[in-house]
Amino acid sequence: MKLPREIRDQICIYAVLSPTTAPDTTQSFEELTESRVNFKNPNLRAWCSLVLYSPNPPTSTVTSLLLVNKQLHSETRSNLELLAKSPYCSLDLIILDEIVLLPTWTTIPVPDTTTLNTVDVTFRIAGVHQKKKEYPYGPYKGFQIGDGAGPAMQWQIYAVLERFIRAGFSGETECRNTHKHITAKRINIDIQTPPDVSPERFGRPANGYPRRRRKEEPKTVLDPDYLAGFVRGNLGGLMVGLNYEWFNYGQILYEHLDEIVLCKDGVEIERWDVAERLKNVVPESHLSREKLAEYKEEAWALRRARGLKVLDN
């Protein structure tokens, strides 16, 4: 505590922003999933919510710093107030064996905030598809196609976003109807190429065709370019409003986000201005001009109240 206050503040902020270690993807399927659970609350709209979370609340260095002594408690509080002006968090998201998603919060500087400036999401691909791993998770998961529902993975990714907006960092609530309305100025999504995998091993999802018989298990690894296109198509579809269903599920984006940026290995692929997308949604056969105008008026009011970008129609 004899260091100058400026240096102590730098050390404190460094400690608060230092990420926790993300799971090691060289572990086996069983090692990565054995301690994880599929949360029940809140009630999600996603058709498939097969996402396995750690049952323990996300950890943060903030709590330990606050408990050291009165002086450090006070200084940490002051630094948290500064960080709260531009709150940031980061999420590690593993797609394991093309079947399940494993989210892990690695940075949570301000755990109790509901208004975030930036959310960094890193997609990592782990393992190869093995049919025997599918059985505990039911018939609809991963890239398998559902009757009229598209690949389950689009809903699993949607469920991660929906649960975050509704439940925050903990991912779970006591009540089914809880909605914390977490907002973010920007979500940065970076899809990373698995290290130490030769390009010729990359391929399309091996579990996307459940009725096709195979004599042996595939040896391919999910292609990060395919995954980037998959995420791009599904996120873009939610904000285009091509039909009532897409528009209906896209409302959670319209009401809680300003911008989504999609990258692969740090290189930008697509950038969506959510307010601009909302402005440009047009009526279609299942949504009258009057109903759309009514919704937009409500959505703009919500965005204004939540400090998000608002445009003139």
Language model region names:
Residues 309-313:
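A positional/structural detector of protein chain ends, strongest at the extreme C-terminus
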Residues 9, 52-297, 307:
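C-terminal-biased hydrophobic
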Residues 1-35, 39-52, 63-64, 71:
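N-terminal Skp1-binding subsegment of the F-box domain
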